[in-house]
Amino acid sequence: MNKYDRFLTRGKPIDGSKDYAYGTLNIIEVCPSPIKIGQEDTDCNLYKITYRVPNTVADWNLPYPQKSTFVKPETVGRYTGQDDVLRNKIFEGDIVSFDDINNDRVFGIVIFNMDTLSWAIADAYKIYYDLCRASDMSIIGNKDDNKILLKNFEWNWSEYV
């Protein structure tokens, strides 16, 4: 794992692009207006991902050229440090499949388990699997692009996504 990968984050740009932006997440606090004119109070932070631009020349004494894009907060996911069988990076919010100890095919969503402070996979029955066997996993989608996959489960995924 690259030393910068532990900070790798992805998110969907607010401009409506279907592709994720990958890079370092910056959360910019925007002070809410002291006067509200009939508007709901929403998240007052802006989420921006900064990423490298290959094959360009840096300026302002930066070690490499950078660009930034604002992303939707609900699509932000952190890199887990693990790769799947095809060496794709596994991010928070990915939907994965793997064989459990009984060789049954399991589908679940990658979450950060706050009880154990570790990466885990929650399946349709709220059973948590450790992410340590990521080399046997396949990414089959993610929570943002494949909402139909989440509808097949019996319990409410909204507490995890």
What are these regions (language model features)?
Residues M1-V161:
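Secondary-structure transition motif
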